[in-house]
Amino acid sequence: MEDVITEASPPSRFLEEDLNTFTPPSPPVTPFPSLHFPQQQPLTPKLLIIALSPISLSLFHPHLLPPSVPLLASLTLPNTNPITLSPLTPNSFLLSVPSSIPSHHSHAIAKTLIGHQIRPDSVLVFDSLSPSNYRGRLPSDEAVAFKLDTSAERKAAEGEKILEGLEYYPSGSVVDGLAAAFLARCQLLNLRASLCVSWPEFDRSVMALIERLLRNGVLRGCDGLRFGSQVLRFGRKKGRGFESELYS
């Protein structure tokens, strides 16, 4: 009697090319980001501020208008505006990301920029809070902001933290995309880093909150620093706050 479990299966009645007709075509290979970094040596700022959210991009908009400041580096992906690096103060740089970045590029971008070409002492990331990633109900008419820190930042003494007076992101809530990749990269390199997520995505009260955090914190004493007053939308597609790629 034949053993139906261990017996070799009979040959398929279909040809190989016939089976392939039911297989969806492979997605096209996306070109890797193109980095333009004219510096001979890695940059070593004391502070690197990364603006991902529309609010933070609006706040730093006066520093993104050419020819106000020279660009130190730029990184370009297909169908997106370039990521640019520019000086903000003598000791701090601004990395602006004006377009949504595909999730499969996030860790590659974070690894390319932090630790190789840019070696900061500390990193501050601004991103929007995604309602689909938040455990709880967000107020519709109230500005809120939370932070996540690396282990090195948590060990910093009071009065020396990057974001003073800001509550931690509630347990059970998640962060994804480029913001999470930057924070993970800083954790891997044992860098002091904080991620600030804010809500609503487009609101002047959030802009005022972030400006106050900066002027009373890491940018204290930078009186000549100009901040934007208009909330700009920077072409974010389909509202990043409502399309999470965490489980895709």
Residue ranges and their predicted role:
Residues 1-139, 188, 245-247:
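N-terminal catalytic or cofactor-binding beta/alpha core of small enzyme domains
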Residues 136, 141-248:
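C-terminal folded domains that constitute the principal catalytic or ligand-binding module
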